[in-house]
Regions:
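Active-site neighborhoods of divalent-metal-dependent phosphate/nucleic-acid chemistry enzymes
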Residues: 141-150
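A short, glycine/Asx- and small/polar-enriched loop/turn
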Residues: 15-19, 88, 136-139, 177-179
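Alpha-to-beta junction loops
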Residues: 137-142, 165-166
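Acidic beta-strand-loop-alpha-helix segment within the catalytic core
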Residues: 43-132, 179-207
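Conserved G/P- and acidic residue-centered "switch" motifs that form tight phosphate/ATP-binding loops
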Residues: 29, 58, 160
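Flexible, acidic active-site loops/lids enriched in D/E/S/T/G that coordinate Mg2+ and/or position polar
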Residues: 1-48, 55
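Hydrophobic residues within well-ordered alpha-helices
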Residues: 133-136, 157-162
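Acidic, metal-binding active-site segment of PIN/NYN-like and related structure-specific nucleases
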Residues: 3, 7-9, 164-181, 186
Length: 207
């Protein structure tokens, strides 16, 4: 007996430690609708409050990203890892706009500005699950976004940690499933991103 938490259905059962499938059948919906080939299926399996397995599939590029707790991460069957980037200098960072929380736009843009000035470049592809997968596999050095949903994060967050990266909420803790706020990357990039986010904490934390 399993539970399902999905963007299209919500909880089907809760309240115990049996496996919960956390599913986003189409991450990057706007891209899909407009014919932009950047979207994915994201599936995580949690036992209790920990995601134990995750898979992200890009049906256009035929990429499959997998992770299991304690066994590492793979990209199309080959082990993958985050980059060795020691900090934001020279880093390629991914992000997403706070389209679900317009009240965060001003603090987000302040954070964006500081990250932009500190790194090599920023990309906003429009599918958070793939942003996390690409961070895990070394295409991006880090990622940050406000107000994501559990199905956006479940598989990708596990991928990043199993690939040697660091994940946290905007305060540096582990409550990103509850808050929907994610900062991740190589250890050094994560630390630099978190430092910038915290500079503006009074602005976004009050919203």
């Amino acid at each position: 007996d399993h539970a399902v938490l999905a963007e299209e259905s919500g909880w089907t059962r809760r309240g115990d430690d049996r496996p919960t499938w956390i599913v986003d059948p189409l991450d990057g919906t706007t891209n899909f609708v407009h014919g932009i080939p950047q979207f994915a299926v994201s599936i995580g399996v949690a036992v209790g409050d920990r995601v134990e397995h995750g898979v992200i599939v890009d049906p256009v590029k035929r990429d499959v990203f997998r992770a299991g707790r304690g066994v590492g991460a793979t990209w199309n069957g080959r082990p993958c890892s985050v980059t060795s980037r020691p900090g934001l200098a020279g880093a390629l960072v991914a992000t997403g706009f706070p389209f679900k929380a317009h009240e965060l736009l001003d603090p987000y843009l302040a954070i964006f500005r500081d990250v932009f000035l500190a790194c090599k470049a920023i990309r906003r592809p429009g599918a958070a699950a793939l942003d996390l997968a690409y961070t895990a596999c070394g295409l991006f050095d880090g990622f940050f976004e406000f107000r994501l949903s559990p199905w956006d994060l479940a598989a990708g967050a596990l991928l990043v940690t199993e690939a040697g990266g660091v994940t946290s909420d905007m305060d540096g803790g582990g409550d990103f499933f509850a808050t929907g706020d994610m900062v991740c990357g190589t250890p050094g990039v994560h630390a630099d991103l978190l430092d910038i986010v915290q500079r503006h904490r009074d602005r976004w934390h009050s919203e």
